[in-house]
Amino acid sequence: MQGKKIIYQVLPRLWGSGRFSDWDEPAFGYLRSLGVDYIWFTGIPRHATGKDFVKGNPGSPYAVTDWFDVNPYLAVNPASRIDEFKAMVARAHDCGMKCLIDFIPNHVAADYEGSIPVLSWHDGDWTDTRKVNWNDPRTPGEMLDVLRFWAATGVDGFRCDMVELVPSDKLGHIIKAMRPEFPGILFMAEVYGRENYGRYLDSGFDLLYDKSGAYDILRDIIQNGRSARELTWNWQFLGGMQPSMLNFLENHDEQRLSSLQFAGNPDAAWAAIAFALLFNTASFMLYFGQEVGEDASESENGRTSIFDWSTPAGVSDLSQLVYKGASLPPARNEVLSSYRELLTIARRPVFRNGATWDLCYCNAGTEGFDPDRHFVFARYDDDEAWLVLCNFGSSRASVAISFPDEFRHAAGLVSTGSSIEAPPHGYALMKFNKKQ
């Protein structure tokens, strides 16, 4: 699973008319134009709804009541809902993209009546769920059957929920059993403790959230002025694990980047976005509507609710663009154009698979370079070399970057340094001349 991947998370019930059929050539074509490799469809397995214990009106996608069914409300003809789901997956494949769904090994819905062994209690405030009993010897086999069922529908991988609450060795056995039957299947883990990264990679996961690393640091830089030096420290901590990380600034659990509770607007976060997308070969995830500056202003907590039917304004605007060819409001169009520019750069082979060189250490004393507010790095391969400056400060950055000889030789550069400028909270890119 080498190379940077672009993953797009979406809650289908809030996209278009909320049906599998909405995922057609216009929708997939739009995501293909962004360079998306995998679409993570959240809320596919049938979850509890319409009962007193559920959260919100439709209920939580993470309280699954039947692991071998899809939500009837996603189908035009509920009696054919599995076939409609398979057809959607096939359309994605025809458009050159792969599909992920959630695998939730820690819990099921409170009204679950299937064959997975379940305890009588729940974790935390997940009152609509019951804990899966991983001490029961039947559980691994039951969970393997779930994964086989969905992989047989054409699904290309799984985003695995809250894996730190489940024995890693047992998850590892399941993943190992899936590999021969479904070569190329992807397992992406929601992991929060950096101290657990190695253990879950050893268990066979392909990608891990870098939540307590890149996400927490970038968020704290934006909100509280945390030093950009800590990005270097995280990079050094990750070492050889970097290609297996998933960078993101939004998902369904986190507050919207443009919300008042986070950056406040996209213009305050371009340096962070550029870092998350372009630094090393870690994969990158977008949350639907992020690319047009959706700010969840309809909510009190800065999050797009996964418990309701209400479609965010930014996603509604996207639907008008995708299905009717309507123009986005100017502010949203400007944000989308900026994301397109960065995503286009990220698709270049040098950014997908090339080497990374953190240049902060050799520029700490350079005039104009603020190691707490600036982060500079290079990406290079046999064909290209690029310089990237991320400016987390509130004033324009103008720096004459110095290169150590070992980097210059490794990247095949003629120059010994370059001057580069980046706007406040923004970034700058420069392509080097390489030796012929």
Language model features with spans:
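C-terminal beta-strand-rich structural cap/linker in extracellular carbohydrate-active enzymes
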Residues: 418-436
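Substrate-binding/active-site clefts of carbohydrate-active enzymes
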Residues: 1-38, 42-153, 174-182, 186, ...
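Short catalytic/ligand-binding loop motif for oxyanion handling, primarily in non-cytosolic enzymes
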Residues: 47-53, 107-113, 166-170, 195-199, ...
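Solvent-exposed beta-hairpin/edge-strand motifs
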Residues: 402-415
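A structural motif
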Residues: 36, 152-155, 205, 281
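Loop/helix patches that line or flank the sugar-binding groove of alpha-linked glycan CAZymes
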Residues: 49, 251, 256-398, 403, ...
